[in-house]
Regions:
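Alpha-helical transmembrane bundles and membrane-interface segments of multipass inner-membrane proteins
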Residues: 1-179
Length: 179
């Protein structure tokens, strides 16, 4: 029980840090960047440019922002429930990144213009000409990698039942040889 509480605390701390950093960088982006100008960081590969995303990843579903918000709330609640059952610290950290990223983007959907529940997510990390994202999106990716690592570590610890030797039957007492 104590380990479960510790892992839940790890998840909550990671999620809180992700939310704070995500919302802080979005505020900074809103105050310093423009939609019509890109600041290159690594050539044309990575830059800073303000964008507002009414949809999901790659702006999919941009006409259904309220649906994305409702689905996002449900998925986030399910993730928090799953996170409380994390089996190891890697899983707790992974769920923390994912929950923090999901909540970071939900805050935008709930409280950013144009209106409550249909707000646009603030994006500012321009990946070439592919898409523009934010640190919540990065946290979602990091969390997924952590969960994969946790799964690989767990599967390595569990021996394959097929590889276990058959149990040895004890020799019946009447067949025991006495010197």
């Amino acid at each position: 029980m104590r380990d479960r509480v510790r892992r839940s605390a790890v998840m909550l701390i990671v999620a809180a840090i992700v939310i704070l950093i995500d919302q802080g960088t979005k505020t900074l982006a809103l105050n310093t960047l423009r939609q019509d100008a890109r600041i290159p960081l690594i050539g044309d590969w990575l830059g800073l440019q303000l964008a507002f995303n009414p949809g999901a990843i790659f702006s999919l579903g941009e006409g259904s922002t309220w649906v994305i918000t409702v689905v996002g709330l449900a998925v986030t609640a399910a993730l928090i429930g799953a996170a409380t059952r994390a089996r190891n610290v890697w899983s707790a950290v992974g769920f923390g990144f994912i929950v923090g990223g999901a909540i970071g983007n939900l805050i935008d959907r709930l409280f950013s213009p144009p209106a409550f529940g249909i707000g646009h997510v603030t994006d500012f990390l321009a990946y070439g000409n592919l898409f523009i994202g934010n640190l919540a999106d990065v946290a979602l990716g990091i969390g997924a990698v952590c969960l994969i690592v946790a799964g690989l570590r767990t599967s390595r610890r569990r021996p394959d039942p097929a590889s276990r030797p058959d149990p040895v039957d004890p020799v019946p007492a009447e067949e025991t040889v006495h010197p």
